[in-house]
Regions:
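Substrate-binding rim/cap in mid-to-C-terminal beta-strand-loop elements of soluble/periplasmic
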Residues: 1-39, 43-53, 68, 79-81
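A structural signal for well-ordered alpha-helical segments within the folded catalytic domains
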Residues: 19-26, 43, 139-142, 151, ...
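Non-transmembrane alpha-helical segments in soluble domains
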Residues: 25-29, 33, 46, 78, ...
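Structural helix-adjacent loops and short alpha-helical linkers that scaffold large soluble proteins
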Residues: 35-36, 159-161
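Amphipathic alpha-helical surface "interface" segments used
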Residues: 49-52, 185-192
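WW-domain-binding short linear motifs
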Residues: 56-60, 165, 181-184, 188
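C-terminal, low-complexity/hydrophilic appendages and adjacent surface loops
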Residues: 64-158
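Bilobed periplasmic-binding protein-like "clamshell/Venus-flytrap" ligand-binding domains
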Residues: 172-184
């Protein structure tokens, strides 16, 4: 990520701290003296840019219907679906669209209104069973990569102690992100 923050007067330097794109909005808002909304995730990067002060221990990432991934900057853990996990895959939306098409009549016929999430500000959402691409895993494999020794993520490693720590980060961040219960089931995890 390339970022310039006039508050820091830093230019042409690298940082090692783990940041995410979601940190951009709070950084820009605070630069202009505006407090981010309470449900906005991410951190102001002013101190990270100035002197590499960390803002997080781990970051959650992935794509809808794919692996749930977490990194601590050293390791990347990619959690695959468990057998039968696709039965727990749903689309949660108020805009019943796939990327290129509307939801079908059959899909909408199976939809139900459910309580929303912290970021839907009290609105209920449609819960639609996942169908089509992105609703069944391309692989059920789980991977752990050591970026220090395999930056290209070509050779997964086996390390139960690291995997346990990464699962802890993943569960903690999924809970903080208000992940719906079925995703914990599809990934073979339980909430703490």
């Amino acid at each position: 990520m390339f970022i310039w923050d006039p508050r820091s007067k830093k230019c042409g330097e690298r940082r090692k701290s783990l940041v995410q794109n979601i940190d951009m909005a709070p950084t820009i808002l605070r630069y202009f003296g505006i407090e981010p909304p309470k449900d906005m995730q991410g951190f102001d990067l002013e101190r990270t840019i100035r002197d590499d002060t960390p803002v997080r221990e781990a970051a959650l990432f992935g794509i809808h219907g794919g692996h749930v991934n977490v990194t601590d900057g050293r390791y990347v853990y990619m959690r695959g679906w468990v057998e039968g996990g696709e039965a727990c895959h749903y689309n949660y939306t108020l805009t019943p669209m796939h990327i290129h098409t509307r939801f079908s009549v059959e899909e909408l016929g199976q939809a139900e209104y459910v309580d929303g999430f912290s970021f839907t500000k009290g609105l209920k959402v449609l819960k639609v069973p996942g169908t089509g691409r992105g609703s069944s895993p391309q692989t059920r494999e789980t991977f752990l990569f050591d970026l220090e020794n395999d930056y290209g993520q070509m050779d997964p490693v086996q390390d139960s102690e690291v995997e346990e720590r990464m699962i802890h980060y993943m569960l903690q961040l999924m809970q903080e992100n208000d992940a719906p219960e079925p995703i914990f089931v599809s990934e073979g995890c339980c909430r703490n």
